[in-house]
Amino acid sequence: MSRHHDMLDRKRGRKTTAASGADVRARLREIVGAENVLVDPERVEPYAGDALKEKFPPEAVVLPASAEEVSQILRLANERLFPVTARGGGVGYTGGAVPVDGGVVVGTDRMNRIREISADDLYVVTEPGVTTYALQQAVEQYGLFYPPDP
């Protein structure tokens, strides 16, 4: 048994941790707002896997809008000992964004602002939820392009 005190929820086919507790979910709702805590199976399913197609449904998906909210979520996870998986676009092939230990997925969907574009110095400052497409569209206005892969 891991330090997260998890067990397999055979009914739902996923691990359960302290993140399933009503008090934890209530606190998560306080942090990010009720509409940004997803627990329905249909709503968490898109966050259960990546391009490899192996699925591990989380107990909840939390969609913070700021670094401060992420900090509060991680503080709660540390206090209550439930696992957290960070997730951007979920298009990787390595399983890094897959919640294999259950717990909570912290989705960066709402953290999608481009903070700064410096055409002279060739850098961009973004939040973690900015999509490649949005970034390409933004830098194109400066006569630049973003080549994400070799």
Task: Report residues per predicted region.
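N-terminal beta-alpha lobe that positions the nucleotide/phosphoryl donor
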Residues: V24-R25, T94-A97, L122
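N-terminal accessory segments
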Residues: M1-A51, E79-V84
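Short glycine/serine/threonine-rich phosphate/pyrophosphate-binding segments
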Residues: V70, Y93-T94
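N-terminal glycine-rich flavin-associated loop
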Residues: L28, L52-V84, T108-P150
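Short basic, glycine-rich beta-strand/loop surfaces that mediate nucleic-acid
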Residues: D101-D109
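Short acidic, glycine/serine/threonine-rich loops at helix termini
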Residues: G95-V100, Q136-A138
